[in-house]
Amino acid sequence: MIWYVATLIASVISTRGLVAQGAHGLREEPEFVTARAGEGVVLRCDVIHPVTGQPPPYVVEWFKFGVPIPIFIKFGYYPPHVDPEYAGRASLHDKASLRLEQVRSEDQGWYECKVLMLDQQYDTFHNGSWVHLTINAPPTFTETPPQYIEAKEGGSITMTCTAFGNPKPIVTWLKEGTLLGASAKYQVSDGSLTVTSVSREDRGAYTCRAYSIQGEAVHTTHLLVQGPPFIVSPPENITVNISQDALLTCRAEAYPGNLTYTWYWQDENVYFQNDLKLRVRILIDGTLIIFRVKPEDAGKYTCVPSNSLGRSPSASAYLTVQYPARVLNMPPVIYVPVGIHGYIRCPVDAEPPATVVKWNKDGRPLQVEKNLGWTLMEDGSIRIEEATEEALGTYTCVPYNTLGTMGQSAPARLVLKDPPYFTVLPGWEYRQEAGRELLIPCAAAGDPFPVITWRKVGKPSRSKHNALPSGSLQFRALSKEDHGEWECVATNVVTSITASTHLTVIGTSPHAPGSVRVHVSMTTANVSWEPGYDGGYEQTFSVWMKRAQFGPHDWLSLSVPPGPSWLLVDSLEPETAYQFSVLAQNRLGTSAFSEVVTVNTLAFPVTTPEPLVLVTPPRCLTANRTQQGVLLSWLPPANHSFPIDRYIMEFRVGERWEMLDDAIPGTDGDFFAKDLSQDTWYEFRVLAVMQDLISEPSNIAGVSSTDIFPQPDLTDDGLARPVLAGIVATICFLAAAILFSTLAACFVNKQRKRKLKRKKDPPLSITHCRKSLESPLSSGKVSPESIRTLRAPSESSDDQGQPAAKRMLSPTREKELSLYKKTKRAISSRKYSVAKAEAEAEATTPIELISRGPDGRFVMGPSEMEPSVKGRRIEGFPFAEETDMYPEFRQSDEENEDPLVPTSVAALKPQLTPMSSSQDSYLPPPAYSPRFQPRGLEGPSGLGGRLQATGQARPPAPRPFQHGQYYGYLSSSSPGEVEPPPFYMPEVGSPLSSVMSSPPLHTEGPFGHPTIPEENGENASNSTLPLTQTPTGGRSPEPWGRPEFPFGGLETPAMMFPHQLHPCDVAESLQPKACLPRGLPPAPLQVPAAYPGMLSLEAPKGWVGKSPGRGPIPAPPATKWQERPMQPLVSQGQLRHTSQGMGIPVLPYPEPAEPGGHGGPSTFGLDTRWYEPQPRPRPSPRQARRAEPSLHQVVLQPSRLSPLTQSPLSSRTGSPELAARARPRPGLLQQAEMSEITLQPPAAVSFSRKSTPSSTGSPSQSSRSGSPSYRPTMGFTTLATGYPSPPPGPAPPAPGDTLDVFGQTPSPRRMGEEPLRPEPPTTLPTSG
């Protein structure tokens, strides 16, 4: 029994605890439940019952926050208590949960669940759980405006639209589908829309839209504006023909819509027009119908709708009635003034306007153009310049238009009348102050009496003025508006006449400017105007401007400087509308504003970019290496709307891309690259071109060219390229070798022929021009050398004269030949030293010629095997052999020892041996090098040695110098002194200077220098004196001007000085007795200013009886001469210099003149070649004078290898005095001695036209040295006082031509020669 009670108590206690825990500790945290409107939801609330036993009774209550009583109560098995709002929707779910069906938005909120245990005390115990219910609902309107809403025009109206939903919806307003935002016209706030200043444009449908994520709701309201009607379709202009019906439409809208329409014609109701009211009708929609229109119905029609609210609108249109042309109110009498122009008018009425008006006079058609002074005007009127009685008559007119005509006018009679005239004319100008009275007179008369009226030109005046009966114009108080032009008009039926005057009102404000113009740019505007009247005071201007959209109070004033009537306004906005006006002001006030001009500034130039058409690059570029090159392959671009035009292939080796090919067809997908460099890394890329657009480059493909180049081998296509190139090169080399071999063979053959021909040259002899003996020219046997050749000889021309085969020579000949070869070898050597030359001379110079005799012993002198045959000499010319060609010279000088032979000639005889004509024969050079002694610059009397006459005396004559028959030496040495060896004249190294037996048939020399006329009937000199520019330093000398050389003789060096150093200018004690006048023609000499003075050089006398070979003979210089050879010059009785250093006297011989003047002396030019005579030889371009035809020259031809020359015997009393000048020898002269050498110009040597030719080559000028550092100046000068002088020739060559010593143009230096230092030449006076 006790156990049972304890168990019962424990169970009760445990049950109470569980219930209390379930009721009090159930879900202490609130629960949130979300549901969509219209769906069902369960609000959970749990109760835990005991495991065993009977559950205690309890009560379930559900509360909603904000509602004081429970919305749901349930106890046991009793029916629940449900709030009316939840009736039918709330029920108990499970033990204590609440189930709500079809939830609503208002069901949202906090709910509390309470469970009450009936067996417990509730005073101190509370339990329950909280649940928040959220209802998601689409927007729904809770407040909306009515479907139609009215508003008065000019007022405001507000339309409100409220919506509810979860989440809260957003409310917006739209008008005709356009979203309305906050503005001056509309105000939108919290779903309300307010329209201010309602106008007719505000009428229409307005839509309220509420939307959220759950949906949207829309409501539409129509706004009706109460006001006057609004014309929706105004009437339009129409054109109808006469008698048709016209229809004018007019439709309007209004609220309220009780509309009435009224139509007006010319501002009068159509129903008030008597002729129109019966033919019009107005329909209910406002259309006006006019039946059977007439021309008078045309005009403006106006439609006015009305609904009794406000001011009714109106709209107008014009009715045009077309009809044929007609004449209205033709006057019966037409008055035309006399003496002035008048009109005959036809009052035409036509629609369309009349095109032709025809006139009839007195019932006949009138041809207006046939009447003088009559003109038919465009309106059909006739203008008469001056009416006469011929114009009198009756006129009718008939107008026509496109619709025809309504007939002719009524007849009108023309009457001539005098026009009115002014009896009082107003003045030209009137000036009066403002506010004062003014009277302007005007009066007229006529028949009928005219009526006088006044009018203002331009803007009419509104001031108080009136016209008096007399016609005058009266102003009681002048105002600013009275200023301007006024006209007095006198009118009667005949015509109207006018008279003008100008009225100036002083003391007013300025008048408004006019003609305002504005020129705009993007940011500037140039405003210009025409100033108005200033009112009598100085006025200024200001420009007013504003933006067009701004109000009337936004004008900005800009002052204008005094003077100009324009202003440049800057800082404007582009593409903006501006308004401009101009205002004038003076001391009395401002003018009215000018008209307002509105302009728009220019907009910035907008360049619309062309749409970019992107071309994708080619794809998948690959490079495959082959033996022939690199094969590049690619795929076309992936996207391209147009076909590919072409591809561009580029490559690079370094950093820079270069184009390989830019014309690969667009249809190709590969390219083969050839001719690549070996062992080089190449990178390639390709670009696509489509319609002038270039794509981006493709991917880069790299390849090395190491294995591209295989060994050259023979393929089917042919030989490899290197093999082919080698074959071509070999063929070219063989062809060139054959060509050069052929040329060399020809050259050698020609040289051999020249040597053979030279060996056949005859010995030199005196040639007489008058002899008719055969010569190589006259006999027809022309030597090949006589033919001119254009090829220059080689530099080795020194050896060209040697024969091809050796001859058997005598010991003397062998001696001469060996010495010649040795001497020439020494001369031709390029390296030279004084010590070497002396040593070689001592070692090689023989004392006597050694030869082997018959017994084998060596003997000196001539060999017995070859007995020496003493050659015969020409008398007076011991250096020339006698030949069979000229018998007049057969007498030898050995057989006839003339006691008159000069001592100098006798001394030279042992040195003169017979010579052959071959150039192989050569006299050994004398063992003496001339030493040049300086002489002072003195006259002839002051010289140490000079030429004197040693032959037989001539009759005394007044001459500046005395001459004998022969030349000799006059030395200052004492008798006891040892005479020096004979002077040696070296070989010039060129055959050009050798004597030519048959000179060219030129009447004058190639140099053309004038001769020096002789004083007192005698020639001073026949020689010409060309002089080269011989620089003394490295720079080219400045040539002297053309000096005037009055020559008195050539014995002294004074002839080389200009006139200020002439012997006539020295002291009287040193002057000769006679001196040539200075009026002689100037010699064409160009003497360099570098020569400090002139030194005379005399040759030493030879030793009598001594052989030239005895004694020490200095070796010739080894340096090769690089100056020009001696050139032949034209002169009579002078020495001719040969290639072996010979002077050849040229003797005159009288002969009758030949026709054409060709009998004179011929000259020997620089290009010494054989000349073939022609019937009429062409004159040389260098011809400067002609010789006298009565004189012919005799050329003395000595052996070309003779070292010295002697004077020939002359039949005349005097013989020429010769001055021989030797070539400078740079190898034997020191610098100190060179500066003292006298420069003597070479003389021109003349030759006979029929003399024996000399076998010499003619080297071209191209082989000459053209360097100005050294030029030869060797020559001979002769004073032939006993010979007549030829007349002077033409002028010398132009000053611009640079000439050498022989008048020739310098040519370039021979290749390979060393330039020689310039040395002045020497002068040698000789006599023979």
From Swiss-Prot:
This molecule's function is given as: Transmembrane protein which is abundantly expressed in interneurons, where it may regulate inhibitory synapse development. May mediate homophilic cell adhesion.
Pfam families from the UniProt entry: fn3, Ig_2, Ig_3
Q: Which residues lie on this side of the membrane: Extracellular?
A: 18-722
Under what name is this protein listed?
Protein turtle homolog B
A molecular-function term among this protein's GO annotations: kinase binding
Membrane topology per the record?
Single-pass type I membrane protein
The residue spans the entry assigns to the Cytoplasmic side of the membrane are as follows 744-1328
What InterPro entries does this protein's entry cite? Answer: FN3_dom (IPR003961), FN3_sf (IPR036116), Ig-like_dom (IPR007110), Ig-like_dom_sf (IPR036179), Ig-like_fold (IPR013783), Ig_sub (IPR003599), Ig_sub2 (IPR003598), Neural/epithelial_adhesion (IPR051170)
| Entry keywords, A to Z | Cell adhesion, Cell membrane, Disulfide bond, Glycoprotein, Immunoglobulin domain, Membrane, Methylation, Neurogenesis, Phosphoprotein, Postsynaptic cell membrane, Repeat, Signal, Synapse, Transmembrane, Transmembrane helix
Q: Where is the composition biased (Pro residues)?
A: 1284-1295, 1318-1328
What compartments host this protein?
Cell membrane; Postsynaptic cell membrane; Postsynaptic density
Expressed, tissue-wise, as follows: Detected in brain.
- What family name appears in the similarity comment? Belongs to the immunoglobulin superfamily. Turtle family.
Q: Where is the composition biased (Polar residues)?
A: 1018-1033, 1129-1141, 1199-1214
Please give the residue positions where the record annotates the modification Omega-N-methylarginine. Answer: 1136
- One annotated Gene Ontology cellular component of this protein: dendrite
**Which residues are recorded as modified (Phosphoserine)?**
775, 783, 794, 1207, 1215
- Where does this protein come from, organism-wise? Mus musculus
Q: Name one GO biological process term.
A: nervous system development
Glycosylated residues?
A: 241, 258, 624
Q: Locate the transmembrane regions by residue number.
A: 723-743
Q: Describe the location of the Fibronectin type-III domain by residue ranges.
A: 512-604, 614-708
How is the quaternary structure described? Found in a complex with MAGI2 and NLGN2, where it interacts with MAGI2 (via PDZ 5 and PDZ 6 domains).
- Where does the record place Low complexity bias? 990-1001, 1246-1273
Q: How is it modified after translation?
A: N-glycosylated and sialylated. Not significantly O-glycosylated.
Could you tell me which cysteines form disulfide bridges?
Answer: 45-113, 161-208, 250-303, 346-397, 442-488
Q: Which gene encodes it?
A: Igsf9b
